[in-house]
Curated annotation (Swiss-Prot):
The lineage of its organism: Eukaryota, Metazoa, Chordata, Craniata, Vertebrata. One of its GO terms (biological process) is hydrogen peroxide catabolic process. InterPro entries: Globin, Globin-like_sf, Globin/Proto, Hemoglobin_b, Hemoglobin_oxygen_transport. Red blood cells. This is Hemoglobin subunit beta. The keyword Glycoprotein does not apply. One of its GO terms (molecular function) is metal ion binding. Residues 2-146 form the Globin domain. It holds the Pfam family Globin. One of its GO terms (cellular component) is blood microparticle. CDD domains: Hb-beta-like. PROSITE patterns: GLOBIN.
């Protein structure tokens, strides 16, 4: 994947403003609320019975932070995303059996969260760069699937 200097700047510039804990928690909570069938991968998280329960669930919050922290590795390694996510792809494929479509859904949710938090900075050009990034990350995570 080729990244222009402008794309890299738009991605890293916005990423520097992201509160990983808050945005990660919100993104994962939104995924579980908007696409309730994704909850089956999080049965060990306890109460996911309502939007209020999901938004207040500390395990959702912690895992959301973990997911977005890992997404930060993509931002730091834009030219090597495939290898950056190689082990996570294996884990999600072989051990967790996560439907790879969920990576795309989470990427789209992340775009919504970023737009909501950074409306002034989230220009159409910025959105295009981030949309490309979440697509590349989703593809890298789905790589180990047969």
């Amino acid at each position: 994947v080729h990244w222009s200097a402008e794309e890299k700047q738009l991605i890293t510039g916005l990423w520097g403003k992201v509160n990983v804990a808050d945005c990660g928690a919100e993104a994962l909570a939104r995924l579980l609320i908007v696409y309730p069938w994704t909850q089956r991968f999080f049965a060990s998280f306890g109460n996911l019975s309502s939007p209020t329960a999901i938004l207040g669930n500390p395990m959702v919050r912690a895992h959301g932070k973990k997911v977005l922290t890992s997404f930060g590795d993509a931002v730091k390694n834009l030219d090597n995303i495939k290898n950056t996510f190689s082990q996570l792809s294996e884990l999600h494929c072989d051990k967790l059996h996560v439907d790879p479509e969920n990576f795309r859904l989470l990427g789209d949710i992340l775009i919504i969260v970023l737009a909501a938090h950074f409306s002034k900075d989230f220009t159409p050009e910025c959105q295009a760069a981030w949309q490309k990034l979440v697509r590349v990350v989703a593809h890298a995570l789905a790589r180990k699937y047969h």
